[in-house]
């Protein structure tokens, strides 16, 4: 426990919290342009082909972002919106692409959890 005199001499240092998504620079989302769209495999013990994109952001960063959902329409030079959120079994992937925003289309035929995949409410059939 420091004395009052020690605190007068040098105040207590604040512990700085390290952000998990530095490329967003304190913004909820960021716009970017896809520089490469490719697939990759997860680390053990999982097995799949995950769709990811390399994105150059307006903040100047180049990041790897995950493309959620079944099927996508992204290609090089597509303008996308990214949010934070890592993919646990893909090392280095700390961002998600938001479906249904800018050039990214929603997931076709999705009826549940639609808001997360950019799908409008289907027309009620008679």
Curated annotation (Swiss-Prot):
Give the region (Disordered) as residue ranges.
104-126
Gene3D superfamilies attached to this UniProt entry: Nucleic acid-binding proteins (2.40.50.140)
Which key words are in the record? Chloroplast, Plastid, Ribonucleoprotein, Ribosomal protein, RNA-binding, rRNA-binding
Q: Where is the composition biased (Basic residues)?
A: 111-126
Q: Do you know which PROSITE patterns this protein is assigned to?
A: RIBOSOMAL_S12 (PS00055)
**Superkingdom in the source lineage:** Eukaryota
Q: Which SUPFAM superfamilies match?
A: Nucleic acid-binding proteins (SSF50249)
Q: What is its main location?
A: plastid
Do the record's keywords include Nuclease? no
Which Gene Ontology MF annotations are present?
rRNA binding; structural constituent of ribosome
Q: Does the keyword Membrane apply?
A: no
Functional description taken from the UniProt entry: With S4 and S5 plays an important role in translational accuracy. Located at the interface of the 30S and 50S subunits.
NCBIfam families attached to this UniProt entry: rpsL_bact (TIGR00981)
Q: Quote the PANTHER family the UniProt record gives.
A: 30S RIBOSOMAL PROTEIN S12 FAMILY MEMBER
Self-association or partners: how does it assemble?
Part of the 30S ribosomal subunit.
Q: Which family does it belong to?
A: Belongs to the universal ribosomal protein uS12 family.
Name of the protein described by the UniProt record: Small ribosomal subunit protein uS12c
Q: Which gene encodes it?
A: rps12
